[in-house]
């Protein structure tokens, strides 16, 4: 790292951002930057030596995990967002190498598949939602039987396998010393929990018997490392799964895609014209989603079945125009194993008029927007009061 990069990090850091369990927050570093920089040069020299020789300082081994309610006023233990607070020097390493250098190198050399929308420049959550609406519309216009599956990966940042993610980072150009340091840092952490009642006295840490995995939400390298794992998953899905195929009547313009990914949310789709090995739409959907579940599990992750669901779009004649068929008009089910050693579970199937919440939007496969307008009206009324 260059000293100028360290200075630039300090200059752009927000003083209100929580950091450094030791108490060395960004305000201290900004004050030091006003002088002759001799102390900052010493700190940067220590930082550079630690990175080059894979040394994790004792002060860096403490992480405070702050638990924030996902639902205001409902402090349920399974509905807490865990944010890791680490020392600011390590946050500098994470932002410089993973966010700036690795992500930029991956984008420049087209190392990330087009299916990835989260954590990338010039990509938005709205694009993934619009894609889904367009898939729904095209399938309805072409009267093509289709399956659309929405999957949520459980606590994705906290289940990244550290050693595997280090290897995946190498394909994006991560230096060996960086991958080695990141692994050593994660495995050396002693975690404390902070809630509204204070910081816990008891701690938990990595051990060979119970290895603590995950890159930790709140640390700058968590996003790029998850995109790396998710990108591996999307490449496997694209190779072995059916996906969708839409084209114009002349065949001059076409779209072939398997899934769209936004962080932990995955939207998988299958159309009638891509079915493999004489499968029907249910068999193909089960094959593709089981491939997805096994791939995630092999990388340390797991599907959140309670937040997942699927549609089967099919058509029945109603007087003159065909309409989207209900569940009882085309019976079938999809069962998947969330992990290699788990029991099969039946996935939740949705009626065509039921809106599924996708990245904050409520979209129904039959094109109905009633649920979305109800939610928007409620939000507007809350803002107005």
Where are these regions (language model features)?
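Catalytic palm subdomain of template-directed nucleic-acid polymerases
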Residues: 155-173, 255-262, 266-295, 314-325, ...
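Catalytic palm active-site di-aspartate
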Residues: 20, 62-65, 81, 116-119, ...
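Inter-domain linker/hinge segments that demarcate the starts of reverse transcriptase
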Residues: 39-50, 54, 97-105, 128-140, ...
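Glycine-rich, flexible loop segments associated with nucleotide phosphate handling
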Residues: 78-83, 203-216, 248-260, 278-291, ...
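Conserved pre-catalytic core of RNA-dependent polymerases
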Residues: 1-232
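Basic, alpha-helical interaction scaffolds
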Residues: 339-385
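Short, conserved micro-motifs composed of acidic
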Residues: 189, 193, 197, 302-354
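Helical scaffold of the NTase/Pol beta-like nucleotidyltransferase catalytic core
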Residues: 228-239, 245
């Amino acid at each position: 790292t260059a000293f100028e990069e360290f200075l630039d990090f300090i200059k752009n850091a927000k003083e209100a951002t929580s950091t450094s369990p030791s108490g060395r927050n960004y305000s201290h570093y900004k004050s030091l930057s006003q002088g002759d920089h001799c102390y900052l040069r010493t700190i940067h020299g220590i930082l550079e030596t630690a990175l080059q020789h894979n040394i994790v300082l004792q002060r860096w081994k403490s992480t405070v995990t702050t638990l924030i309610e996902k639902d205001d006023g409902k402090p349920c233990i399974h509905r807490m967002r865990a944010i890791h607070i680490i020392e600011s020097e390590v946050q500098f390493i994470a932002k410089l190498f993973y966010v700036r250098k690795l992500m930029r190198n991956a984008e420049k050399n087209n190392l990330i598949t087009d299916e990835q929308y989260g954590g990338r420049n010039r990509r938005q959550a709205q694009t993934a939602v619009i894609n889904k609406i367009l898939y729904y519309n095209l399938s309805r216009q072409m009267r093509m039987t289709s399956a659309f599956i929405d999957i949520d990966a459980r606590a994705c940042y906290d289940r990244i396998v550290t050693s595997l993610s280090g290897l995946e980072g190498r394909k994006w150009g991560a230096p060996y010393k960086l991958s080695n340091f990141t692994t050593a840092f994660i495995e050396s952490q002693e975690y404390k929990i902070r809630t509204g009642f204070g910081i816990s006295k008891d701690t938990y840490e990595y051990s060979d018997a119970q290895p603590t995995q995950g890159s930790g939400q709140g640390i700058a390298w968590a996003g790029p490392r998850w995109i790396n794992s998710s990108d591996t998953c999307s490449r496997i899905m694209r190779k072995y799964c059916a996906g969708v195929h839409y084209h114009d009547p002349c065949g001059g313009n076409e779209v072939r895609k398997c899934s769209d990914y936004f962080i932990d949310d995955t939207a998988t789709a299958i159309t009638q014209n891509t079915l493999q090995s004489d499968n029907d739409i249910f068999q193909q959907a089960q094959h593709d989603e089981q491939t997805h579940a096994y791939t995630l599990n092999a990388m340390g992750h797991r599907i959140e079945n309670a937040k997942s669901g699927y549609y089967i779009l099919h058509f029945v004649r109603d007087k003159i125009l065909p309409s989207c068929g209900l569940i009882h008009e085309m019976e079938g089910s999809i069962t998947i194993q969330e992990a290699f050693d788990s029991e099969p579970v039946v996935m939740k199937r949705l009626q065509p008029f039921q809106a599924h919440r996708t990245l904050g939007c409520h979209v129904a496969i039959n094109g109905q927007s009633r649920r979305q307008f109800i939610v928007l009206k409620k939000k507007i009324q809350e803002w107005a009061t």
